[in-house]
Amino acid sequence: MNPSEMQRKAPPRRRRHRNRAPLTHKMNKMVTSEEQMKLPSTKKAEPPTWAQLKKLTQLATKYLENTKVTQTPESMLLAALMIVSMVVSLPMPAGAAAANYTYWAYVPFPPLIRAVTWMDNPIEVYVNDSVWVPGPIDDRCPAKPEEEGMMINISIGYRYPPICLGTAPGCLMPAVQNWLVEVPIVSPISRFTYHMVSGMSLRPRVNYLQDFSYQRSLKFRPKGKPCPKEIPKESKNTEVLVWEECVANSAVILQNNEFGTIIDWAPRGQFYHNCSGQTQSCPSAQVSPAVDSDLTESLDKHKHKKLQSFYPWEWGEKGISTPRPKIVSPVSGPEHPELWRLTVASHHIRIWSGNQTLETRDRKPFYTVDLNSSLTVPLQSCVKPPYMLVVGNIVIKPDSQTITCENCRLLTCIDSTFNWQHRILLVRAREGVWIPVSMDRPWEASPSIHILTEVLKGVLNRSKRFIFTLIAVIMGLIAVTATGAVAGVALHSSVQSVNFVNDWQKNSTRLWNSQSSIDQKLANQINDLRQTVIWMGDRLMSLEHRFQLQCDWNTSDFCITPQIYNESEHHWDMVRRHLQGREDNLTLDISKLKEQIFKASKAHLNLVPGTEAIAGVADGLANLNPVTWVKTIGSTTIINLILILVCLFCLLLVCRCTQQL
């Protein structure tokens, strides 16, 4: 065979060698047992939460205090490991995995909002220019411009009529209002010289309180200084307007329908004919609609106004006062002067200067009011957390007591760019809600006594097992503590698993806290202090609830109470309506529920003596020390005699063995 033929035959042998490798690889992988599969109950452990670690530290500290052991890092670690091992070593009874325990929980500051109603106290509305608009000033708003205008869909309930502004049923409608002051005469032919301010305000539905007699209307008349009978006198400076609250002689109705009756006792200044002393036929002394529409037709188009008549022009309802609407039916609530500050900021205000002159035409007196405007002032009004403004196509349904709005925007400020085709709904963050939550274990104020007792028995009987358990706990501390997370609910269906409430409330807490942050450089301003007091009041109320409640040991962001949820007494539809903010006869009786929960919390204060339980564990663990065993054995006389006899017997045996050798 020549070399060329050998080269042609060599490759097949190499191919057989290469084909042998995959077979060897497969043989190495071949097993005789079935492939092991993870059981459905096997779950990946999550890292421990801060609440769990904090609670574990508190329990360890309490244990060291009760046992009078010095708190060192080593002792704290051992105490924490001991507590974790006690809880983990509890044998789970059959069917316990499927057990479901449902309790009432109080969740402070959830990610929910409610409507501000006419029965709520007035809120703080801040303006950027206090020269022309009275009220607290703050030109730093909005605090977070990047969050202005976030889209939201809402469906919330209400008990009392909500506060709404705009052209929709249940909302106060906007209109232009004028305020007039008289300045010193600057011309011999001028009877009066005026400064007038025009701005957006609240539209009266009825000029006077016609639905009640004058005597009955006095029942709703607020206390305050009556409005002046003469036009207020001001200086020549058109850049200053002094506001002074006063009460008019009669009220106007802003709303009178199924949503309630809302009135306002602020003056509504208008030009009208003064017919006193006139012998000829004089137009009605009531405000002329034509004149009124001519004065207030538009704040943009008309920069010159002229009123002419053979009769003197008179300004009715003197006074420079802002509207202060209040509800009088079906309930009587407080005044809300802050609403006007939101309305007036929706469009710039216009400043007028002019006079009233007297001439003679056809041998008759002829009166002319001439007003000119060359100055407009843009405004901005803002609210601060926990309050917000929902802007959009808001629909209020009185039959179901619900408010809906799709594709609405969340704002904190209103300025002259606002479009009155939308409506404004005042909302605020919910202070807290009561909801049922489910747990996979019974409620406990601390690691329960029976768990510690049962585990302690096993540990004392098998001390080696305790050592191995301790090592296992050290190796898997993160996985162990992660199993203690609590459960939560789904808002729109029923009671569900627990992690939902924790994440739900944690995210909302971060949201409200970020919105309520205060600029420390300007913390000395009174407005910041005022808003901080309002916000802290809600926090103190939440803390008051927490102090009165006995909470489950494994939760800190919200409180799971020992009160068991009874579905037959409070069905889920009642809970759902409570979450929506509806407080009718079908919703939860919160006051009664609180009373029951506070009683249950008080009863559990003495049912879980953690001090005795931890002390018992400490005594049991002390018995594991071999030194104590020797000390105890050596302290008895009988045992000592037996030991001496045993030693003598052994010595005797040793002596005999040595003699035989």
UniProtKB/Swiss-Prot annotation:
Signal sequence range: 1-89
Transmembrane segments: 633-653
Identification of the protein by name: Endogenous retrovirus group K member 25 Env polyprotein
InterPro entries noted in UniProt: GP41-like, HERV-K_env, Retroviral_env_glycoprotein
GO cellular component, one term: plasma membrane
Residues under site feature: Cleavage: R465, F466
The keyword DNA repair is annotated on this UniProt entry: no
Sequence similarity: Belongs to the beta type-B retroviral envelope protein family. HERV class-II K(HML-2) env subfamily.
Further remarks about this protein from its record: Has a type 2 genome. The HERV-K(HML-2) family contains type 1 and type 2 genomes depending on the absence or presence of 292 nucleotides at the 5'-end of the env gene resulting in Env proteins of distinct sizes. Despite their overall retroviral envelope structure HERV-K(HML-2) type 1 envelope proteins lack a predictable signal sequence. Subgenomic RNA transcripts coding for full-length envelope proteins have been detected for both type of genomes.
Region (Fusion peptide): 466-486
Chief place of localization: virion
Chain segments carrying region Disordered: 1-47
Keywords: Cell membrane, Cleavage on pair of basic residues, Disulfide bond, ERV, Glycoprotein, Membrane, Signal, Transmembrane, Transmembrane helix, Transposable element, Viral envelope protein, Virion
Highest taxon, organism lineage: Eukaryota
Pfam families, per the entry: GP41 (PF00517), HERV-K_env_2 (PF13804), HERV-K_REC (PF15695)
MF-aspect GO terms: structural molecule activity
Keyword Lyase carried by entry: no
Gene of this entry: ERVK-25
Localization (cell): Virion
Residue spans of biased composition, Basic residues class: 10-20
Record note on quaternary structure: The surface (SU) and transmembrane (TM) proteins form a heterodimer. SU and TM are attached by noncovalent interactions or by a labile interchain disulfide bond.
Biological role stated in the UniProt entry: Retroviral envelope proteins mediate receptor recognition and membrane fusion during early infection. Endogenous envelope proteins may have kept, lost or modified their original function during evolution. SU mediates receptor recognition.
Organism this protein belongs to: Homo sapiens (Human)
Mod. after translation: Specific enzymatic cleavages in vivo yield the mature SU and TM proteins.
